[in-house]
């Protein structure tokens, strides 16, 4: 990296720090999305409750955030929701759920909140990103996941819509996505250069073809092993924020982590992110000062073998979200107004009683 590049990066970081100092108190909207019809496994609808029970609201409040908990959305199951093309499951139900979520996220972002959506399965990201884009059309997306979720309704091997949301979001893929029931309201809101994947390690053949043929940026676990997570984040920001600052939407699937850390999820894949890598991603996103919305999805308490596995996965989800809003690994810092900025000085009498003094 050249001296000029280092200088520009340092300057941008200083500008971001100034932005964060000016906005020391985030206004955060938390929206629960207890939805499971984008996949086949029971239990992911309990994800929002598990994450809340792990202390999310208290953690954000302790970080100085002004938290507005919007509660959980209600999603209706559409009767007679038949398969599309003999394979795509629950298209009308998923389409309606995404529409409901899009409206709620749009309201929250429009009211000035940074929006946190608790899933629920990853099909919901079509709704959250669409709603975000209604208020911030120039947004960019960082998609942290073991899977690319970019199959189309014509390439999906499973028929599960949680493996397809990105194909609905990208303008370049619209001639490949048929008009399926339940999605007549939907419009693509991203270009391929607006999204970067991190943590991929389980791609279907069609997904691999799409990523390479359309030149969509991604960093697999092999890339992370070879380059290191620091370099991955630098390249991610160079692409998404290199020319201008713009809102970031982070869509984080808990299965991006190794199953040893996040066992309570529906599609675990061995060889995932470490705790340090995952939290470094969110810490760096926070440091840009540009985070505008977060999805945390696919926590499934029912699939855990023990209550300890539920607790570990939910606690990890809370750490991911909290580090998006300033939680650091440098100590338990809380509200900015409680941070000590002047060290106490020993009194004269105290000093006289002690022959050996160590001065700071």
Swiss-Prot record:
Cofactor note: Binds 2 manganese ions per subunit.
Residue numbers binding Mn(2+) 2: 145, 147, 253, 255
Primary enzyme class: hydrolase
UniProt keyword Manganese present: yes
Residues binding Mn(2+) 1, per UniProt: 122, 145, 149, 253
Annotated binding of substrate, by residue: 147-151, 158-160, 204, 267, 298
MF term (GO), any: arginase activity
Induction notes from the record: By thyroid hormone (T3).
InterPro entries in the record: Arginase, Ureohydrolase, Ureohydrolase_dom_sf, Ureohydrolase_Mn_BS
GO cellular component, one term: cytoplasm
Protein's GO biological process: arginine catabolic process to ornithine; urea cycle
Pfam families assigned to the protein according to its UniProt record, in alphabetical order: Arginase
Pathway named in the protein's UniProt entry: Nitrogen metabolism; urea cycle; L-ornithine and urea from L-arginine: step 1/1
Catalytic activity of the protein: L-arginine + H2O = urea + L-ornithine
Alphabetical UniProt keywords: Arginine metabolism, Hydrolase, Manganese, Metal-binding, Urea cycle
Cofactor(s) essential for the protein: Mn(2+)
Documented EC number(s): 3.5.3.1
Tissue: Expressed at differing tadpole stages in tail, intestine, hindlimb and trunk region. Strongest in tadpole tail.
PANTHER family in the record: ARGINASE, ARGINASE-2, MITOCHONDRIAL
Family of the protein in this entry: Belongs to the arginase family.
Subunit structure: Homotrimer.
Function according to Swiss-Prot or TrEMBL: As well as its role in the urea cycle, may be involved in tissue remodeling.
Protein name: Arginase, non-hepatic 2
Organism: Xenopus laevis
Lineage: Eukaryota, Metazoa, Chordata, Craniata, Vertebrata
